[in-house]
């Protein structure tokens, strides 16, 4: 159904032609009709009024129809403004040129009233559908932007302070590849002497992955609120096993989550960790060496119901830094398709310091390596500096 309030601009240097077109349009029930005698008047009118359709003559003095189309195309107005060319030139070349410049349709003079009616109404109907589609896309984009804001709000702020007599620093980072992503980064204290680091990567991307990420995040946070949380996270295999059961049971989406969970006893420096299909964490020592924590392995969460995960252990000494990343860093690609790899991450960790600046430098290094290639995967990282020297 065509909007009877549609605004139409008739552009022709001959007054009789403008009058004839206007009368035909009014017979269709369209009453909001303006006229312009040349291209300059047309552009001035279009700048002031949001028209729904322009009927444009080609051959006009001062500024012809080609010039009008070129001007509208240059400032992007043709994306929202349909134009029907009304031409006295019974040749295809000028019409083809107009279509290439962005016109939606054409009618030859002298025009057939039935054909004029059909093309005007069809173009206006397409305009309505196009506007609805544009508005729906804007609404969805606004929702995605809001979801991105909410997801980034889940990333905990940096921490620097004292715990059981030690100076602890934690930095976390999340860079979704799309508006929302499937990477999870979190840390929390349990009691006065235990900190838990969590990093996950959902197998998919976009809104579905973000929902899976939010569910996983909520499950771990729920465990952290239990009265037995200190004992539960002292052996992170127990916590990982419980979350895996919840995700694997009835997993109709077949999504899974690679996950690294690390629990650190701040009094002793002993850490226990589980890697559920995740990239091994990096451990940078004060002597400049960087080790990989390759133990504590098992399948990603949500795949094998009832799997018995086992934790592995390591020990932190003053000044050590523990880094966990998702494969959005290591599997970034340059224009030739070469992977960034895991080694450069360790080199940057060894050369840098702790804190948010270190994580940002890693992101910048990956961006430089990609050399303009679009980010293909979410990037998340968490960095713990133990007993800052």
Feature names for model-found ranges:
Residues 312-324, 329-389:
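C-terminal catalytic subdomain
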Residues 35-53:
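Acidic, metal-coordinating helix/loop segments flanking the phosphotransfer/catalytic sites
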Residues 15-34:
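Two-component/phosphorelay signaling modules centered on CheY-like receiver
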Residues 44, 66-79:
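Short amphipathic alpha-helix used as the core "switch/output" element in two-component signaling
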Residues 134-321, 371-389:
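… and, occasionally, acidic/histidine-rich disordered N-termini of signaling adaptors
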Residues 16, 37-41, 59, 64-70, ...:
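Acidic catalytic/metal-coordinating carboxylates
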